[in-house]
């Protein structure tokens, strides 16, 4: 154990040394608030439903609750989550977008959690749900990071025996936290934070995140139903479509639009706004390869006619040769053969 600690510290130090300013600042804030909790009461930094709403308006807790931890194992989870996000998501998004994602998820978790406990109080009239419950910690952001990893690298294998992919990690961890809650080993705010982190991060990444191709990610593998087992996906997909249609009618969400830009007869440009660039490029290459192979097979069949046709044509040429009505076309002056290959080009971004 003593030999492993220096190696772990050296590895962690190397990771932090190569991290961006955003990752370093978030890690430093988590450590500072944890050390501060030994000197003063940091309860005012967590979201308390009764104090977030009027007449108190503890609005600053929406920004601080995701950085506040009370146990050393919680600090380890927070630091690991931030470092993983910096290593895997920041190279794809950039430091600013990672900070925006962190802020959106944590503010959403604070608001949704406070509203949920407010509704629970209205149903039970138990003041514990207003003034005793404290929402804090990095479980909400952890849920958001897992959703983002499902979007970007869902096919990666985390465990080989049994085989567990990144795409199933969000719901697998939710089921584990639910079991811990049923066994009274986990408090309800932690489970609520993780659940609302999953939901808010998916909504942001699906509909609102800005990138070079527009907004959001409407890929099929990132649909809400794909978070659930296959047997439940048809029912969940139907309910999700109904909710989305309702949100479109009240103008909270935008209607999904797929734009097809046909530039010329020999060139077709297909633009699907809201898709991940890597996923879109992979789909284009697969479609192009399959289409070229099919066209090649058709051309081969037209080039090699049957033997009967060859015999009939040769017999006709020997028996009754006819002069050609048309003069042979000089090489280089005829029409160039039209290419049968279809290429995919990136369409200009929609304004």
UniProtKB/Swiss-Prot annotation:
GO annotation, biological process: negative regulation of cell population proliferation; protein transport; retrograde vesicle-mediated transport, Golgi to endoplasmic reticulum
Pfam families in the record: DUF1751
InterPro entries recorded: Rhomboid-like_sf, TMEM115/Pdh1/Rbl19
Tissue specificity statement from the Swiss-Prot or TrEMBL entry: Expressed strongly in kidney and skeletal muscle, followed by liver, placenta, pancreas, and lung, with low amounts in heart and only traces in brain. Widely expressed with ubiquitous expression in epithelial tissues (at protein level).
TM regions (residue ranges): 20-40, 98-118, 127-147, 166-186
Stretches for region Mediates homooligomerization: 1-205
Stretches assigned to the Lumenal side: 41-97, 148-165
Residues with PTM Phosphothreonine: 329
Region spans: Disordered: 301-351
One annotated Gene Ontology cellular component of this protein: nucleus
Role summary: May play a role in retrograde transport of proteins from the Golgi to the endoplasmic reticulum. May indirectly play a role in protein glycosylation in the Golgi.
Subunit structure: Homooligomer. Interacts with COPB1. May interact with LMAN1. Interacts with the COG complex; probably through COG3.
The protein, known as: Transmembrane protein 115
Gene: TMEM115
